[in-house]
Structures are given as structure tokens and as C-alpha cells.
């Protein structure tokens, strides 16, 4: 079943347990976010931080995957996107667990008195260059407002000693991000290289870093099989969310 088959309403994306409206968000629901939300390790997680929540997709996916006593803080700089995320949360099964903060993570993070077991982000990754159609889309796509070194430093200040910081990035940018993280004292613990099919090279990488050293587990995920249907591994990862799986 194709991903587009789940988009039953034109202004958003329908999942099995919730709906994500995204017509007022610069970055729409896409495969990158769905992969990250389904992949991030959640065992024994007690508190979650979503940096740059956008429509609230990752916060909602993680709410579905975790116990009902796990609070989730979702921070979004763009006021329009944050309002839409708040509406998506309010209409979901977990309005009591997810708090959307309309704020700059660089201002919000230093004020926090608790640390997070899981920090997740689908971060911007383009260097400033060609102008986007709107300032909101430029903010979502380019690193000018939140470069990767700053993001890594903020996550380091907010994470528990044995927590995980998870991101999804294009393959080459992910390699550079990994080296930057290692230089800053992070340890790479999980890596999944994502390819569209067996014949193609990976185009995305899912990364999980921790302040704590340990073995790094690496694997490869192929989205589609030779018949162009979703692969067994992709189906197993995402079937709790996609409506027609």
C-alpha cells in the first residue's frame, strides 16, 4: 500500500490512532519523520523532548509508543506551526501527556530543571542559500536558526546520563553530523541506513547518540521490495501507524 493511501483528508495525514493536520506547517508529514518516530528507542523512557516539533508528528508517535505516565515536551519556534501542533494534540488520545511550547529551544532549554531520557529531532540540514517561498519554510529547512553544533550542545545539556538523542538526516550530512557529535563527546549507539530499494544506495540515516559509551548497533532498512510494495522490515517498523497496513 502506498503512503499516499493514508492521506484521507487533504489538509493532513490520517494514522491509525490520530490525525496530523499540517496545512499551516512549513514542513509536511513525510517518510523521514514517520521513520524516526517509529524507530527511536523507547524502552524505560520516563520523559521525552521533541525539538522542532512542527505539526507535532513525532510527539504524537512517541505518545502512542510509550506508557501513559510518560510526559512529552514539544518545542516549536514558529507560532503558526506550534498552534497547529497544539490542535493536533488536543484532538489526539494524549492531550494530557503532550505539552507544546511556542519558544526558541535556545531560550527554552536553559530554563528546564529536569532532564530527558529521550530527545528527538527531525532537524533542518540545508546551509543557508537559495531563498524559500516563506520565512517559515526557510526556518524549517535551513540551519541558520539552529545549526547542528548548537543542537548537539542543547541536547547534551538536557539529556540524562544514559538517555538517547535521535535524529534523521540525509546520508552524507548524517555522516558529518556523527563526526561532529563524536568530537563533542557523544557516543553513537544506533545507526540505521535507509535505502529506497535494494538497488539504491542509502539516502537517509537514523542516528541515536548517548552520553554513555557502549556498543554501536548498525543495520540497513530498505523501504520497498522488488515489487515496489513496502518491504517486510519497513512494514514491521511502521504498521502500528499507517492506516492501511
UniProtKB/Swiss-Prot annotation:
- Enzyme class comes to transferase
| Localisation per UniProt entry | Cytoplasm
Q: Name one GO cellular component term.
A: cytoplasm
**What EC numbers are recorded for this enzyme?**
2.1.1.223
Family matches, as InterPro entries: DNA_methylase_N6_adenine_CS (IPR002052), SAM-dependent_MTases_sf (IPR029063), Small_mtfrase_dom (IPR007848), tRNA_Adenine-N(6)_MTase (IPR050210), tRNA_adenine-N6_MeTrfase (IPR022882)
Q: Name one Pfam family in it.
A: MTS
Is Cytoplasm found in the keyword set? Answer: yes
Any single biological process term in GO: methylation
Task: State the function annotated in the UniProt record.
Answer: Specifically methylates the adenine in position 37 of tRNA(1)(Val) (anticodon cmo5UAC).
- The protein, known as: tRNA1(Val) (adenine(37)-N6)-methyltransferase
Q: Which organism is it from?
A: Salmonella paratyphi B (strain ATCC BAA-1250 / SPB7)
Amino acid at each position: 500500500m502506498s503512503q499516499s493511501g493514508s492521506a484521507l483528508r487533504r489538509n493532513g495525514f490520517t494514522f491509525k490512532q490520530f490525525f496530523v493536520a499540517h496545512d499551516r506547517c512549513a514542513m509536511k508529514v513525510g517518510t523521514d519523520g514517520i521513520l524516526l518516530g517509529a524507530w527511536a528507542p523507547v524502552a524505560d523512557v520516563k520523559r521525552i523532548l521533541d525539538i522542532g516539533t512542527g505539526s507535532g508528528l513525532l510527539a504524537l508517535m512517541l505518545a502512542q509508543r510509550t506508557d501513559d505516565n510518560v510526559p512529552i515536551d514539544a518545542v516549536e519556534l514558529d507560532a503558526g506551526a506550534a498552534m497547529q501542533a497544539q490542535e493536533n494534540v488536543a484532538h489526539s488520545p494524549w492531550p494530557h501527556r503532550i505539552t507544546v511550547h511556542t519558544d526558541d529551544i535556545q531560550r527554552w532549554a536553559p530554563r528546564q530543571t529536569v532532564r530527558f531520557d529521550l530527545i528527538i529531532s527531525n532537524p533542518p540540514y540545508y546551509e543557508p542559500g537559495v531563498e524559500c517561498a516563506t520565512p517559515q519554510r526557510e526556518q524549517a529547512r535551513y540551519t541558520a536558526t539552529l545549526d547542528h553544533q548548537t543542537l548537539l550542545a542543547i541536547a547534551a545539556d538536557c539529556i540524562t546520563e544514559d538517555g538517547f538523542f535521535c535524529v534523521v538526516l540525509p546520508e552524507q550530512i548524517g555522516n558529518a553530523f556523527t563526526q561532529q557529535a563524536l568530537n563533542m563527546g557523544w557516543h553513537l549507539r544506533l545507526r540505521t541506513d535507509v535505502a529506497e530499494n535494494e538497488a539504491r544506495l542509502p539516502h537517509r540515516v537514523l542516528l541515536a547518540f548517548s552520553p554513555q559509551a557502549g556498543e554501536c548497533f548498525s543495520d540497513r532498512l530498505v523501504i520497498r521490495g522488488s515489487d515496489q510494495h513496502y518491504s517486510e522490515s519497513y512494514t514491521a517498523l511502521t504498521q502500528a501507524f499507517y492506516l492501511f497496513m
